[in-house]
Amino acid sequence: MPSTRETILAALHARFSALPAAALRGEVLPERVPAAGLLLLRDGEPGEPEVTLSPLRYHYQHRAEVEAVVQGASRDATFDTLCASIGTALAADRTLGGLCDWLEAEAPVPVDLPIEGAAPLKAAVITIVLHYTSSDPLA
């Protein structure tokens, strides 16, 4: 049986997979970026939990990361559309069907990355804060 953390991250990846951009989890940046953009989900860090003792529960504010990447002449507009679609997907159900207590995204800080012999990339790391509770740090 998957852990609470893995179940939530898999649901988040599934949510991103429904978007027009290609969504990968734990992969390296491919050589080609699709026209609609690319989302790379990184598991991130669960951080130190707050602990309650009766019953024993671990309350996490897990910081997963999504690398949003676009390429091409209209990368500014494509990047904006990609970020807006991420926000819409997250706002549609902030508990991922009850798997977590709440999730929210932090604002991206985009950067333009020049690529020799190709169109530049526009990319940003978007932190997604996942609030959830588990009965065990490994469960």
Would you name each region that the model predicts?
Residues 41:
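Paired acidic/hydrophobic, glycine-rich loop segments that form the ligand-binding mouth/hinge
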Residues 1-33, 44-139:
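Charged, amphipathic alpha-helical segments and their flanking helix caps
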